[in-house]
């Protein structure tokens, strides 16, 4: 199980790094299309309108990766169990008070929509919620 979590963590890290690194490059050519396409763990191609500024992370593993990437200030919503996790208390106290959007087993789509995110990150086990996010034009990666 630990090996599986480590593999998933590394995969999510790769996705997130590719998403954020693309926005960090220097480009002297004016681009009319800042679209970024990422492939999530389900093999879906997800198109983003540039680097996300408002992110919801409903799973502590993806949240910890965002913290390690130094982009926790872009988080607008996190998992419901944040107050019980030592990680937040030690390295990102400011996240504890963000709106709770769900757990690794369920997610509140209405709460997510109210936060007007540029990107929602969910665990793969919540893939049945993807069509609901797509109906609302909210990019989601799993």
Model segments located where?
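Bacterial Sec-exported substrate-binding components of ABC uptake systems
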Residues: 2-7, 12-13, 22-64
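Short alpha-helix boundary/capping motifs
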Residues: 25, 94-97, 140-141
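Residue-level signal for beta-strand positions within conserved beta-sheet cores that form or flank
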Residues: 34, 71, 136
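Acidic/histidine-rich, surface-exposed loop or edge segments in extracytoplasmic proteins
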Residues: 40-42, 114, 136
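Second-shell loop/turn segments in exported
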Residues: 46, 52, 117-119, 142
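A short, structured surface patch at a secondary-structure boundary
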Residues: 57-113, 119-121, 125
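Charged, glycine-enriched surface loops/patches
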Residues: 128-142
